Amino acid sequence: MKKNKISKSWVIRQRRDKYVRQSKLEGYRSRAVYKLKELDEKFKIIKNNLSILDIGSAPGSWTQYLSEKSKGSKIMSIDLKDVEKIEDVYHVVGDFLDNKKQKIIKDYFPKKIDLVVSDMAVNTTGNKNLDSIQTGELSLTCLLYTSPSPRD
């Protein structure tokens, strides 16, 4: 019974959310795109002809925006889930920390990656402390992976 109430309240909230409606009107896969748009408008991070890696890309709205905004760029997205194809984007299904997936990333970007974006989130458990710890670990792991090593 409780799950059903949560589902109903989620549906109601989704219907009222202006960003959900706007994302549908603009053809984006999720409302999350507006976080990236806001960052880009403020910091001008997305330019043309970049090498871009989107980690944790499903459902793909950030990747859509990157593909539209960054003309001539080489873009790879990676996620545990498959996503609907986005033109001129190479999507990899799997864990970005897996050695085989890291090799795929390095082979695709033999020189350097200009921009790494990530909107990853853990599957929440309902335990706020555990969810917070897991989210922090995920963010730290992504940061450490993308940070240059001393030899770079």
Segments the model singles out, each with a brief description of its role:
Residues 49-58:
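Conserved class I S-adenosyl-L-methionine
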Residues 81-112:
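S-adenosyl-L-methionine
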Residues 113-122:
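Short SAM/SAH-binding signature in class I
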